[in-house]
Amino acid sequence: MEMDLPSAIANAQKEHFHADWFLKCIHWLLSLAILVIFSSIGSVYSLINSYNRRSLIIQTISFVYSIIDSIWGYRDYFGHENKMCHGTGIFLIFFYLTVLIIGFYNSKINNSNKVISVTYKVLSCLIVLCGVIRLSAGVVSMLEFCYDDHTGQCNAHGIMGMSFIVYGVLLSVVLVVPWLRVNKGKYSQEMYDSTVIMVWGVINTFTEHRPWEPWSHGDYQHTSMGIIFWAAGLLGMFLSINRKRNFMPALTMILTGYAMSGHVQELIISTKVHAFFGYVLMFGGLARIVEISFLLDDKDESIDGEIRSFQYLTPFALILSGILFMGANEEQMQLVVNLGADHSSYILTITSAAMILQLWILALLRFYLKLTETSKTNNSAYDDINTLDHSDGQSQFELDNFSV
């Protein structure tokens, strides 16, 4: 029996749907490899002056790919280009171009201008963050999320979740890099943390509720979170005077986790994911208090001089909670329900992603320390040779502009 015309059209559309989905997945994975993984290696190279040339090569390759990526773009199943992907793609092209211009100029002047050198390093690290945003836009386009009324809610989850991840990354850097782990600055770590928390709280207090609309249950929840943030931040700043360590940033994590653990959602699975997010955040705050109170001496080093495995818990908890919160938006929770999965399966998958991300961050930090050690060794060897006497009275090596 021959298939009728409507059925044939439906089957053709279904085959096109699967082929289009396969190509989008390949495109996304390729973007992950080049715009995030490859670019993050280039960012590490950029932090050491003697490896700037390698970082520029990697950034040039990524820049060329970003142009191709923007031209290709992500297209949803209705045939029109997703505006967010197009916008982030164009922004990434100009951002890469800016970094390359500054990087080539910095290389030309041999890192002699500290402002240019520091600017290049900072922008090189921000490239990775831009790549992550680009990939997030790809997911939004592939799954057709965050359109219309869902846009604000997705943005809130994305921004807040990314903030937790960035905080976890910063704590990992401070923990692993020795010259940052030993606090010799004017202020303690908690002074910086409390200041950011205070500013964030002020912004949330006055932006979570529209004055011309009646107060809702969600408005009370989000505004109260903003109030506790700036109140805790101010107290933390006061307790940080004279480079004192204190518990307020960690206590803020615990209070935030407590509030989110009881944040009831429309879907049961969403309520459970939010609850687990809260538990993880509370655990991370408790681990931070234990670390500051019992594992660090007066010089902010571990008592035995080594990093204990317990100290990795807080950065990991922040990264995990950030990914959980980013993945707890309304439409993503509905997708999990439609797939027939439960909250435990989804949480385990998210936790696996957080572990891989933490692994990659720690690997990059170890790579940075190794490059720094190698660069210093090479410089020391060159300096020793440069001081040797030669029969012609001339030095065989010119290293006046060479710096780590």
Predicted regions and their residues:
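Extracellular/lumenal N-termini and interhelical loops of multi-pass eukaryotic membrane proteins
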Residues: 1-18, 133-137, 325-336, 342
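N-terminal signal-anchor module of multipass membrane proteins
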Residues: 1-75, 95-96
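Membrane-proximal first intracellular loop
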Residues: 11-23, 46-56, 77-85, 109-123, ...
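Transmembrane-helix exit/juxtamembrane "anchor" motif
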Residues: 42-48, 101-109, 172-179, 234-244, ...
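Eukaryotic helix-linker segments that join adjacent hydrophobic helices
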Residues: 56-135
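Non-transmembrane, juxtamembrane loop and terminal tail segments
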Residues: 112-115, 126-129, 195, 253-255, ...
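Generic multipass alpha-helical transmembrane bundles of integral membrane proteins
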Residues: 131, 135-304
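C-terminal transmembrane module of eukaryotic multi-pass membrane proteins
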Residues: 287-294, 301-376
